[in-house]
Each structure stands twice: as structure tokens, then as C-alpha cells.
Amino acid sequence: MPVSDEDVEHVRRAFASFNETARDREDEAGIRAHHARWYDPDVEIVNADNWPVPASYKGTEGYVRWYRENYGPYEDVRYDVDFLDAVGNRVVALVTISGRPRGEETELAVQIGLVYGMRNGRIARVELYLGHDRAMQAARATA
């Protein structure tokens, strides 16, 4: 089923919320609240290129684990969205994610691609790709 403009906007607002409410996610209650606002309860998150670690995460507990493993070691994490649109049957976001290792001054940045599957207006699946090209290829394969 094709994604709607509302689905694309939902993902856009989820990125904005992530950037605006980082301090709210410093404890587990904040992480769970962010999940409840934007994600389907049965969301599946897949590190498709085995980056940063080979893993997949399912449901609320999986989201909490994913968040802690991927963002816990960093401060001032933010997403800068370079591209966001419907591609095939998915929403694709090409982003630069940046942050600093806790207690360090050096900022790290990496370009990733995220391919979103939507269900009932919420994020139901996320595939993370290292680099933009792989994400676009994966999304086009769903068309």
C-alpha cells in the first residue's frame, strides 16, 4: 500500500520532536513516551547493514534497548534531514546524525538512510542503512 503525505509528515514531525526533546529521553520514561507518540507498539527496527551493530529490535522493549545502545553513549544527538519523501511503498529519510561521545568535545557525524514502513499512521518498521544510496535502493525495491 502506498504511503500518504500524512505518513511522510508524521516521520518529519518525529525527527523534529527527537531534536527538540532530547533531554526528555534521559530516562526510560522519556524514551517510552517518545516511542508511544511516534511508533506502532509492535515496531521492528533493523540495522540492515549491521551498523552500528548487527541487531534487530521489536516492540516497546526493543525500542528502549535500541535507543540505549545507539544513543546512550552520546550527548547532543541530533538529526539533520537531507531528504524525506515517499519512495515506493516506504518513507525514506536521508539524514546526517551527529553527536558527541559523553564527556568529549569532538562531534561525530555520519550519513545514514532510514526506510520506514507505516501502519495506521504510525512508524511500524525502520531499516537503518549506512549511507544514503543503500536506503534508496532498498526503498525502490518495494515499489
Each PLM stretch: what is its role?
Residues M1-E6, R68-A143:
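A beta-strand edge to alpha-helix "cap/lid" segment located at domain peripheries
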Residues M1-A33, R37-P41, A138-A143:
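Short, low-complexity N-terminal intrinsically disordered segments enriched in polar/charged residues
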